[in-house]
Amino acid sequence: MAMQYIESELRRQGKENLADTIASVHKLNGSDIPFPSAATSIEKPVAQTPETPVAIKRFSRDQLILPETQIPQEVSDILQRAERAGIRLEPYHLSNVVLDENSSVEGWNSKPERWYWEQIGKGNIGQDAPKLSDSWVLVDPITRPDYKDGEQLHISDPLGPLLAKLRKEKKIKNLKGIPAASRFVISPNELIAVVLPEIAELLGVEASAVRLPKAIEFNVIGNMKHPEWGQANTWEWFEDNFEDDNRLAGGDSDNGGLADVDYGWSCGRYGGVAFRPLVVVSPKA
């Protein structure tokens, strides 16, 4: 019996948020699988023509991700521990820049969609969401797979054994039909409470140093370094909260790729939403 997932309904109805597509939980073979229902699509407001000229911030690409310089010792130590653990991380030095919808940056060709900026203006997404903090970030560069009925796996995933262990120990939900090593069908709440702290322990860093990428970090690094992050018809979770108990997600190639920003429940487990860890190393005072 085939499992039903939210993605199929999203593609039938057109783009809408992940959370509002789900009306209940499908009980299938003892598993808690979110399933789509006939939800009303969210209308995203049509852009209005500004009455006055908009000030455009102009940056070079090197003002967002600083050119490679000498890597701090703390960053090098984390990279070495990650390598010993079989985890690949890429270091990027982000600058202290606040972007907006009208910012002009060479290579920033697929900006977050209009809805993202509108929700920041409405206060549903934090005001600091489009800010790149002055810090080194070490990000997992793995490519998401395309959707295959929830059974898809990241190729040669170094986190697979850890995720299988956590499911076996019942620290994260083990759902029937979902591969034990899968990065999918894990809720943001489980990621924050269990998975990311376990990764921090593997890397020998404080739990607070490991988080999900913000939507703007995913977008900027994706544009500049990893366009393939927007070329799979799956999503990934972001660090940003939305409203009271939701979390941003995005990256779906069917809905704009790198520009795509959606949201889902923080407690939701979705067959097409994965994650990537990011380690933050802030400058020493």
Regions found by a protein language model. Name each.
Residues 1-209, 223-285:
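Short acidic-hydrophobic catalytic motif
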Residues 209-220:
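Short acidic catalytic loops
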